[in-house]
């Protein structure tokens, strides 16, 4: 009986940990080989004027290529182009690009290999005096808004000083020549990934090899009011054959982003189709310190999606998109209603968004949580089965050893 029970326990444990191992083995194993290039194709005697530069981040797959291009000329923008060729390349007609950013001066060749293109452009930074502490720009009086900061007029840092080849990241910082930005800046950090993973820093968005990450922060900017809050305005540019919508998904797990159970997804689909070709994804949370603790988190909300007429004032957008485009605009506002902590308290706010190809990554439980759930569900079942087996064996043993009269 003892050997039977031991064998049964071992079998059940193998089932439990086999199931857990099956869960742990799942995941996105797709990888890309990422390379980073500054000002592709630029050669002497050509040189760039101050404040003009391109960074090309290339993700090479087994049978396709994903191109990301960051430009600091005009309003900062990140361009995404997918090609079904492993030999595709970014080519720039530098004289045309420098002089007028004329349409077609930046291309991905062969052009016939391009299947999808989109871009995110950061156009304005708004500031308003939230005297009623609603953290809702829609409820703020028009007179409480200050003139917006036009990001196309910012003086941006040189890209070659912040390019990290090994980490596949680049940081772009800029500001106005005004008192507000005398000791402050608005910065964007772009990261491109070889495989699935997460940043250690909150909000720890799940990324994959088809996505890039933009982290935006405002640091040290002197507010123009005692109760100032900021709004980031940005636009999505894509081909005319695509339409956009913003979806909100809920989750039962806040393991990676404490107290946040929702994720917003700005997705792009072909007209008259629900299939997703591209996305921007973020969680409705921002942070008031560079190294935040739980208390440094604050809410952020997005406005309604609106259709925008006119090309954004960005050199890379004007240089790449040669055909009809469809442009949408969205605002992200920061702050929580009735929160006594305004921007002036820390003079810092950060927000993170993913931009990528295909369906947005979807959060799932971590390996630790899966093991805990599996063991928690199966352990009671093990004891029930063992109890039943023990009772049955004990009963049979009692019957077989009972006194039987001799005929």
Curated annotation (Swiss-Prot):
Major localization class: membrane
One cellular-component annotation, GO: lysosomal membrane
UniProt-annotated location(s): Lysosome membrane
Keywords from the UniProt entry: Glycoprotein, Lysosome, Membrane, Signal, Transmembrane, Transmembrane helix
InterPro entries hit by this protein: NCU-G1 (IPR029382)
Keyword Transcription regulation carried by entry: no
UniProt-recorded name of the protein: Glycosylated lysosomal membrane protein
């Amino acid at each position: 009986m003892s050997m039977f029970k031991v064998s049964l326990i071992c079998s059940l444990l193998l089932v439990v940990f086999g199931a857990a191992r099956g869960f742990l083995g799942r995941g996105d194993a797709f990888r890309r080989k990422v390379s980073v290039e500054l000002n592709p194709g630029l050669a002497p005697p050509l040189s760039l004027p101050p404040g003009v530069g391109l960074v090309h981040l290339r993700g090479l797959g087994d049978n396709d290529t994903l191109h990301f291009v960051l430009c600091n000329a005009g309003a900062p923008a990140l361009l995404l182009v997918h090609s079904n060729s492993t030999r595709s390349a970014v080519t720039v007609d530098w004289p045309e690009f420098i002089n007028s950013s004329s349409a077609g001066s930046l291309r991905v060749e062969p052009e016939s290999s391009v299947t999808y293109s989109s871009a995110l452009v950061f156009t304005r930074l708004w500031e308003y005096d939230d005297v009623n502490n609603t953290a809702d720009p829609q409820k703020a009086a028009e007179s409480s808004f200050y003139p917006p900061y036009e990001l196309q007029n910012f003086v941006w840092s040189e890209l070659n000083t912040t390019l990290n080849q090994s980490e596949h990241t680049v940081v772009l910082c800029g500001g106005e020549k005004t008192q507000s930005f005398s000791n402050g800046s608005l910065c964007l950090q772009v990261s491109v990934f070889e495989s699935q993973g997460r940043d250690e820093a909150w909000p720890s968005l799940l990324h994959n090899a088809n996505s890039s990450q933009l982290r935006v922060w405002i640091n040290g900017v002197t507010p123009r009011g005692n109760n100032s809050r900021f709004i980031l305005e940005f636009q999505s540019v894509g081909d005319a054959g695509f339409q956009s919508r913003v979806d909100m998904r809920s989750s039962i797990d806040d393991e990676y982003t404490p107290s946040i159970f929702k994720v917003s997804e700005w997705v792009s689909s072909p007209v008259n189709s629900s299939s997703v070709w591209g996305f921007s994804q973020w969680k409705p949370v921002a942070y008031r310190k560079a190294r935040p603790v739980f208390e440094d988190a604050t809410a952020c909300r997005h406005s309604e999606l609106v259709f925008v007429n006119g090309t954004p004032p960005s050199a890379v957008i004007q240089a790449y998109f040669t055909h009809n485009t469809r442009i949408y605009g969205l605002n992200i506002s920061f702050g929580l209603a009735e929160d006594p902590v305004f921007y002036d308290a820390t003079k810092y706010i950060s927000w993170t968004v993913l931009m990528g190809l295909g369906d947005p990554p979807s959060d799932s439980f971590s390996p630790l949580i899966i093991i805990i759930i599996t063991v928690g569900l199966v352990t009671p079942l093990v004891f029930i089965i063992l109890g039943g087996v023990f009772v049955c064996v004990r009963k049979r043993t009692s019957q077989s050893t009972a006194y039987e009269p001799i005929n």
